[in-house]
């Protein structure tokens, strides 16, 4: 696999499907690197890594720390950093934090949530040499305000709003869009309406690529599994089995053996 760039992602529109998963540290970044196109250092780490109820508590310092770690482990995959809640509520703050993310984390692009109301912010970042991935549909940073995680596009008005958002972000300079929690037929319409790749999560198959949280898809989270997640491994049970066997060997004097001693 050749090194993935913002330019090569844009060229995948209507061509090869784009693959993206989250990554939060160097260890897993090395395992994922080159297997997928994009490693997203998502603010989802607040939940899957930090045990929070939603993504809102995490800040810029933590995002940069984890992204630096991912960049140390990734050589081929494109690394994208999420702009956390409160880091881009004004255009000036967005530019300051995006520049900081670029300079300190090593990421190749930033991702931020919001539709047409964030168009001017995205345009400002793009004008200053920052590659931006948009995020519309279900926006996790808005769940408290919206009262939970709700599928979008069920009503005609919502569908038209999503189309307007996608077009506005395309015109503002995003190189790709994440479309989350959107009815499949509406997601297909959105993907067809713009020239940039649309990467879905819980938005059906008729888009330009897919993204999942790694701990969901590899079975490390044993709680609620969303409908859109496919488990490719039962990671939690494998890890627990290994730890259990280690503890048993120690207690019964089988570890370390003579071969494992100096």
Swiss-Prot record:
Annotated binding of Mg(2+), by residue: 43, 82, 113
Keyword hit for Transcription regulation: no
SUPFAM superfamilies in alphabetical order: Phosphoenolpyruvate/pyruvate domain
Main location: cytoplasm
Subcellular location: Cytoplasm
Bilayer-crossing regions: none
Cofactor info, note text: Binds 1 Mg(2+) ion per subunit.
Catalysed reaction, written as an equation: 3-methyl-2-oxobutanoate + (6R)-5,10-methylene-5,6,7,8-tetrahydrofolate + H2O = 2-dehydropantoate + (6S)-5,6,7,8-tetrahydrofolate
Pathway in which the depicted protein is active: Cofactor biosynthesis; (R)-pantothenate biosynthesis; (R)-pantoate from 3-methyl-2-oxobutanoate: step 1/2
EC number of this enzyme: 2.1.2.11
Pfam families: Pantoate_transf
Entry keyword set: Cytoplasm, Magnesium, Metal-binding, Pantothenate biosynthesis, Transferase
Positions of 3-methyl-2-oxobutanoate binding: 43-44, 82, 111
Record's GO cellular component terms: cytoplasm
Cofactor(s) it depends on: Mg(2+)
Gene Ontology MF terms: 3-methyl-2-oxobutanoate hydroxymethyltransferase activity; magnesium ion binding
Active site positions: 180 (proton acceptor)
Single GO BP term: pantothenate biosynthetic process
Keyword Metal-binding among record annotations: yes
Function: Catalyzes the reversible reaction in which hydroxymethyl group from 5,10-methylenetetrahydrofolate is transferred onto alpha-ketoisovalerate to form ketopantoate.
Self-association and partners: Homodecamer; pentamer of dimers.
Family from the record: Belongs to the PanB family.
Name of the protein this chain belongs to: 3-methyl-2-oxobutanoate hydroxymethyltransferase
Species, as recorded: Wolinella succinogenes (strain ATCC 29543 / DSM 1740 / CCUG 13145 / JCM 31913 / LMG 7466 / NCTC 11488 / FDC 602W)
Gene from which the chain derives: panB
